[in-house]
Structure formats: C-alpha cells, structure tokens
UniProtKB/Swiss-Prot annotation:
<dbReference type="GO" id="GO:0019631">
    <property type="term" value="P:quinate catabolic process"/>
</dbReference>
<dbReference type="GO" id="GO:0008652">
    <property type="term" value="P:amino acid biosynthetic process"/>
</dbReference>
<comment type="pathway">
    <text>Metabolic intermediate biosynthesis; chorismate biosynthesis; chorismate from D-erythrose 4-phosphate and phosphoenolpyruvate: step 3/7.</text>
</comment>
<comment type="similarity">
    <text>Belongs to the type-II 3-dehydroquinase family.</text>
</comment>
<feature type="binding site">
    <location>
        <position position="80"/>
    </location>
    <ligand>
        <name>substrate</name>
    </ligand>
</feature>
<feature type="active site" description="Proton acceptor">
    <location>
        <position position="23"/>
    </location>
</feature>
<keyword id="KW-0028">Amino-acid biosynthesis</keyword>
<feature type="active site" description="Proton donor">
    <location>
        <position position="100"/>
    </location>
</feature>
<dbReference type="InterPro" id="IPR001874">
    <property type="entry name" value="DHquinase_II"/>
</dbReference>
<comment type="subunit">
    <text>Homododecamer.</text>
</comment>
<feature type="binding site">
    <location>
        <position position="111"/>
    </location>
    <ligand>
        <name>substrate</name>
    </ligand>
</feature>
<dbReference type="InterPro" id="IPR018509">
    <property type="entry name" value="DHquinase_II_CS"/>
</dbReference>
<protein>
    <recommendedName>
        <fullName>3-dehydroquinate dehydratase</fullName>
        <ecNumber>4.2.1.10</ecNumber>
    </recommendedName>
</protein>
<feature type="binding site">
    <location>
        <position position="74"/>
    </location>
    <ligand>
        <name>substrate</name>
    </ligand>
</feature>
<feature type="binding site">
    <location>
        <begin position="101"/>
        <end position="102"/>
    </location>
    <ligand>
        <name>substrate</name>
    </ligand>
</feature>
<feature type="site" description="Transition state stabilizer">
    <location>
        <position position="18"/>
    </location>
</feature>
<comment type="function">
    <text>Catalyzes a trans-dehydration via an enolate intermediate.</text>
</comment>
Amino acid sequence: MFRVLLINGPNLNLLGIREPEVYGYKNLSDIIISLKKTAVSLNIILNHFQSNAEHELINCIHNSYKNVDFIIINPAALTHTSIVLRDALLAVNINFIEVHLSNIYKREKFRHHSYFSDIATGFICGFGIEGYHFALHMAYKYLTIN
C-alpha cells in the first residue's frame, strides 16, 4: 500500500462557507470522506492534515519524512508567500502535487505566483474538488511507475 499525505493550508477548514462561488459548496470533511473512498479503491492509505498555522504545516511536512510516499498539498494563500514551506518540502524530498480549487491565474495578480509549482511533480488548479481526486489518481500512477 502507498502512503499519501494530503495537506490543506489556511482557511480551507471553511470550505463550503467561504466564497462558495469560488471554492465550492462542499465542506472539507465531505471532501476528505470522498477522497478516502477513492484512496481505498487505489490501495492507498490517505492521511489528511489541515492547519491555519504555517509552523504546524511545516512540522507536518517534517514528520512525513520516511513515513509518506507522496504528498498532495493545497498551500492556499501560503502559495504566494511561504518560502519556509517550500524549504520544508525540499528538505524532506518527497514528490508532491500542488492543488488549488480555483484557477489562480484567473484571479488577482498577486495570486499568480507560486513558490511551489517549479519544484512540484505536478500542478493542478481550477477544477474544484475534482482536482484533489485527479491528484490522488496521478500520485497513484506516479508511485506505481517509479
């Protein structure tokens, strides 16, 4: 079985409440339940972590070292600001896919830059919660090939 860690950054605990026209109407718990069903079908153990605190996200990444085969991360607004989160991902050297529910390039200019996309195995944005499912399938495909 492959071990995949899904990390969600700041404000994603408010999915379904915060700007649902941008981020969708499903809450994070429902999304995780759906993803865990998909993970079972792919023979993946999926663990999830969400925090609004940058240092907790960093600790989660550090703790994934040698315990996780792949990371799927939605850094949320930290995408555009967090060099330290980028450095944490580089330090553990675990392949990851960056996911965003909205298309960050169709939004405000300050959201167009990502500190993660150039070091990510893949980048998915603009497909809502389906982006997470696609990332999970791509993580599985990557892990079975490599």
